[in-house]
Amino acid sequence: MSGLEIRQLQVAYEGARGAAPHVALADVDLRIEPGEFVVALGASGCGKTTLLNCIAGFIQPTEGEVRLNGEPVLGPGADRGVVFQKYALMPWLDVLDNVALGLRFQRVPKAERERIALEMLKLVGLEKHARSQVYALSGGMQQRVGIARALASDPQVLLMDEPMGALDAMTRESMQELVLDVWGRTRKTVFFITHSVEEALFLATRLVVMTPGPGRIADSYDLPFAQRFLQTRDARAVKSSADFIEWRERLVRRLHERNQEEVVS
């Protein structure tokens, strides 16, 4: 069976000093088809990053399972590339060598890994900076290096953990467009987490809303805006359209309602 499948996932952490365990995720079921761009939206503490870490294989669930193409995810693997909010680049390596680092660990010959790394840099528009030092790049450019590095191993799934959270507003918007452009050309399966309603609406082909206490998937919506941008290449027109604004207000109201329900309960 192809695709990513999450079944009855629960993650609980031991309580401090004998306290009851903290349940971060409970009863999470999610299926992601190949080529989908799925965005998980929710406030801090709703378990978004915990869910991504389970998919990445960084942590094992207390109950339930994650399967990729029918096989259980038991640890990290080259079939899943991760882009972090903090760029996690190696400052002693130049841009090209940072992108090629995972391939080096896989013992890919130097000429081949540099060819692949340069190809990925072209994909994100940084081929002219291949031999630049990463600390000399802007935040947005460093995040592009992170995306290129995650793609270099040709993963089936790209996992993006609030990768634009540390960027200024203008850079964030240009990065959103870049991410959609890369997705449109590669059609990788993407799981992206954010707490920004507008970002979620713009990027997602399918949006899942998560709520805390413990983290669960409350709602799921199919959305047209990512495909609309790829057709028109006009992000401002997409984000200022009547249906985008209507969706944004609907989601903000829904999130407030969910948060109020959690406070009352």
Curated annotation (Swiss-Prot):
> Does the keyword section mention Signal?
no
Main location class? membrane
GO molecular function of the protein, one example? ABC-type taurine transporter transporter activity
Q: Which InterPro entries match?
A: AAA+_ATPase, ABC_transporter-like_ATP-bd, ABC_transporter-like_CS, ABC_transporter_ATP-bind, P-loop_NTPase
Q: Where is the ABC transporter domain?
A: 6-237
Membrane topology value: Peripheral membrane protein
According to UniProt, the reaction catalysed is: taurine(out) + ATP + H2O = taurine(in) + ADP + phosphate + H(+)
Enzyme Commission (EC) number? 7.6.2.7
Which PROSITE patterns has this protein been placed in? ABC_TRANSPORTER_1, ABC_TRANSPORTER_2, TAUB
Q: Which domain of life is it from?
A: Bacteria
Pfam families membership: ABC_tran
For this record, an example GO cellular component is:
plasma membrane
Q: Where does ATP bind?
A: 42-49
User: Localized where?
Assistant: Cell inner membrane
Q: Which UniProt keywords apply?
A: ATP-binding, Cell inner membrane, Cell membrane, Membrane, Nucleotide-binding, Translocase, Transport
Question: Does the record bear Ribosomal protein in its keywords?
Answer: no
Subunit comment? The complex is composed of two ATP-binding proteins (TauB), two transmembrane proteins (TauC) and a solute-binding protein (TauA).
As for family, the record states: Belongs to the ABC transporter superfamily. Taurine importer (TC 3.A.1.17.1) family.
Q: What does this protein do?
A: Part of the ABC transporter complex TauABC involved in taurine import. Responsible for energy coupling to the transport system.
Question: Which PANTHER family does the protein's record reference?
Answer: TAURINE IMPORT ATP-BINDING PROTEIN TAUB, TAURINE IMPORT ATP-BINDING PROTEIN-RELATED
Q: What is this protein called?
A: Taurine import ATP-binding protein TauB 1
Species annotation: Paraburkholderia xenovorans (strain LB400)
Q: Which gene encodes it?
A: tauB1
